[in-house]
Amino acid sequence: MTNLRKTHPLLKIANDALVDLPAPANISVWWNFGSLLGLCLITQIATGLFLAMHYTSDIATAFSSVAHICRDVNYGWLIRNLHANGASFFFICIYLHIGRGLYYGSYLYKETWNVGVILLLLVMMTAFVGYVLPWGQMSFWGATVITNLLSAVPYVGNSLVQWIWGGFSVDNATLTRFFAFHFLLPFIIAAATVIHLLFLHETGSNNPTGLNSDADKISFHPYFSYKDLLGFAALLIALTSLALFSPNLLGDPDNFTPANPLVTPPHIKPEWYFLFAYAILRSIPNKLGGVLALLFSILVLMLVPILHTSKQRGLTFRPITQFLFWTLVADVIILTWIGGMPVEHPFIIIGQIASFLYFFLFLVLTPLAGWLENKALEWS
């Protein structure tokens, strides 16, 4: 008799994705982040569902409903802290996952990569609308500032902003629809994740050498299922440690003050994981230019496969591009720092240089270095 997991219509799909999947024998811990992102998504949906049971999306009660969750609901404080800090870990994993893709040339699986970029945009949208829900000062003003950027769209800008607001300012209608979006989007993300995996399993995983690994495959289970389990344990220990010992470390103190349209906080800034993009937005004096730069700071990832010039796939044996990659990492860290600083000298010029370098690395230096390394190989 054949094994049920190989014949059952539903089980064989799971089997082909999680048990009998042939995986390269040499994939490192950098290949763990995909499954960790899956774990993050499941954790966020689970904690979010329990929060939604007690949350009210009305400006009169939203702030106090969050306080009520933390004070009166059984383990509500824990669920809320896990959900808020889970978002941070989600983005840590996303950025490491993207960094791995850039380093090892995984972006040459174009469909998988492009679905991944769409996933990043969806997660960013979800995090943004979610941050508005507690209706604190930074929630309100963050929503006001970011939605206002759409007014830079020529001709239809103002109508667009009022349409999204549901009125002439960020108000009750805005909060209600943001809650609806925040509830809906994670399920769209889950669906897009399935598509992401579907495309990945058409080609199989890349590996640290960037060479074809068909001759050296091992089954996903038990080898990588247990390796993933170790990653799960590390992530969950880190998340619970942060949520239990220092839950407000990454939050903004301004969000402990209920939203007040009459008082603007001294420094309006998003959560840490958006600061690099916020710095790029602010570094351009023109409103429309800033909005386009903000959009392109993420969409530039879609150009990476097109701009790949090297004959080799990964950066494992490419010292020049390796240097550029780590320059990019340092640049994003600098942008993150600048995004959290006030708009004054010397932060303005540092932000502008870092923003220019960000795009210059992606669009000019990396393709050039790839071409140069090809030439060096021809000469040697």
Curated annotation (Swiss-Prot):
Q: Which residues span the membrane?
A: 33-53, 77-98, 113-133, 178-198, 226-246, 288-308, 320-340, 347-367
Question: Which GO cellular component does the record give, naming just one?
Answer: mitochondrial inner membrane
Report the GO molecular function annotations.
metal ion binding; ubiquinol-cytochrome-c reductase activity
Q: Where in the cell is it found?
A: Mitochondrion inner membrane
Q: What else is known?
A: Heme 1 (or BL or b562) is low-potential and absorbs at about 562 nm, and heme 2 (or BH or b566) is high-potential and absorbs at about 566 nm.
- Quote the record's binding site residues for heme b b566: 97, 196
Q: Origin, by domain of life?
A: Eukaryota
Q: What is this protein called?
A: Cytochrome b
Q: What is its main location?
A: mitochondrion
Q: Kindly give the membrane topology term recorded for this protein.
A: Multi-pass membrane protein
Checking InterPro entries in the record gives:
Cyt_b/b6_C, Cyt_b/b6_C_sf, Cyt_b/b6_N, Cytb/b6-like_sf, Cytochrome_b, Cytochrome_b_C_euk/bac, Cytochrome_b_N_euk/bac, Di-haem_cyt_TM
Gene name linked to the record:
mt-cyb
Organism whose genome encodes this protein:
Dactyloptena peterseni
Q: Which cofactor does it need?
A: heme b
- Keyword Transferase part of the UniProt annotation: no
The entry assigns this protein to a family as follows: Belongs to the cytochrome b family.
Pfam families hit by this protein: Cytochrom_B_C, Cytochrome_B
